[in-house]
UniProtKB/Swiss-Prot annotation:
Its EC number is 1.10.3.2. On the 2D-gel the determined pI of this protein is: 5.3, its MW is: 59 kDa. Homodimer. Residues 2-47 form the Plastocyanin-like domain. It catalyses: 4 hydroquinone + O2 = 4 benzosemiquinone + 2 H2O. Lignin degradation and detoxification of lignin-derived products. Has highest activity towards ABTS, also active towards ferulic acid and guaiacol, but is not active towards tyrosine, vanillic acid, 2,5-dimethyl aniline, p-anisidine or violuric acid. Keywords: Copper, Glycoprotein, Lignin degradation, Metal-binding, Oxidoreductase, Repeat, Secreted. The keyword Ion transport does not apply. Its main location: secreted. It comes from Cerrena unicolor. GO terms for cellular component: extracellular region. This is Laccase-2d. Belongs to the multicopper oxidase family.
């Protein structure tokens, strides 16, 4: 989508080795967003 873009730093000591899929709170967001990726990946969040 369009709008502001920010660098996101997601820190979670309990990430499983095969990755993660969890709800992500985005400031100013009014919709549910889920971040999906593997441990150690950069995360792309699409609106």
């Amino acid at each position: 989508g369009t709008g502001p873009v920010a660098d996101l730093h997601i820190i979670n000591k309990d990430l499983s080795p095969d990755g993660f899929q969890r709800p992500t709170v985005v400031a100013g967001g009014g919709r549910d967003v889920v971040s999906i990726g593997r441990a150690g990946d950069n995360v792309t969040i699409r609106f």
